[in-house]
Amino acid sequence: MKILRKLLFWLILVPILLVLLMQLYFFLQIGWWVNHNPDSTSFMRQQLSVLQDKNPQAQLKHKWVPYKRISNNLKRAIIASEDSNFSGHEGIDWDALEKAYEKNVRKGKVVAGGSTITQQLAKNLFLSGDRSYIRKGQEVVITYMLEYWMDKERIFEIYLNVVEWGVGVFGAEAAAQHYYGTSAAQLSAPQAARLAVMLPNPRFYDTHRGTAYLGRRTDLILRRMGSAELP
């Protein structure tokens, strides 16, 4: 019995220690990124692997640019489209989550997510695209770590540089070049609004750029951009 108790003790303790070590890794890695730009993210590496399964020579389109070299049009458009209370919440917008839940219940399917910019960044940096309560819980923990270490401008700068914008396209600079042949600094308001609208499903819109929904949503974001509060 004594041996069984010891075995049970270690069977319980070891997973707990592994989880705690993982959280420590996340915490310290985020602290490092306060002053150092991430070379890639978990999601970027995952997508590169998918592309290279089809073409071993495939590479991602990605170029880091500083926050000040990204058009305010794009910043305002993304906040208006993805997270209107970005400057006001502490990582999770509980009101937005409640509204998204109510909308999904009315529609009978998932049509709204309610994830903030910080939550999206947490997922992109460290996690897979799998959907589970465990992954969602980890996303929440990383979200609060990001908000602890970084100010809003730094969170937004990293987000703008690593978010997916198409098939193998990551970051504002690569997106501006891919879709409009210009730099992220030179994006016009209509261009920025369209890029922001693509974010929920970028690979689809990369190959379906003329959909009616994309046009309608772009017009709506253009009207909302003026009230977006930048960090």
From Swiss-Prot:
Keywords linked to the UniProt accession: Cell inner membrane, Cell membrane, Cell shape, Cell wall biogenesis/degradation, Glycosyltransferase, Membrane, Peptidoglycan synthesis, Transferase, Transmembrane, Transmembrane helix
Enzyme class (EC, first level): transferase
Subcellular localization(s) per the UniProt record: Cell inner membrane
Pfam families: Transgly
GO cellular component, one term: peptidoglycan-based cell wall
Classification via SUPFAM superfamilies: Lysozyme-like
Catalytic reaction list: [GlcNAc-(1->4)-Mur2Ac(oyl-L-Ala-gamma-D-Glu-L-Lys-D-Ala-D-Ala)](n)-di-trans,octa-cis-undecaprenyl diphosphate + beta-D-GlcNAc-(1->4)-Mur2Ac(oyl-L-Ala-gamma-D-Glu-L-Lys-D-Ala-D-Ala)-di-trans,octa-cis-undecaprenyl diphosphate = [GlcNAc-(1->4)-Mur2Ac(oyl-L-Ala-gamma-D-Glu-L-Lys-D-Ala-D-Ala)](n+1)-di-trans,octa-cis-undecaprenyl diphosphate + di-trans,octa-cis-undecaprenyl diphosphate + H(+)
Keyword Cell inner membrane among UniProt keywords: yes
EC number: 2.4.99.28
Gene Ontology biological process: cell wall organization; peptidoglycan biosynthetic process; regulation of cell shape
Function: Peptidoglycan polymerase that catalyzes glycan chain elongation from lipid-linked precursors.
Family classification: Belongs to the glycosyltransferase 51 family.
NCBIfam families cross-referenced by the UniProt entry: mono_pep_trsgly
Protein name, entry field: Biosynthetic peptidoglycan transglycosylase
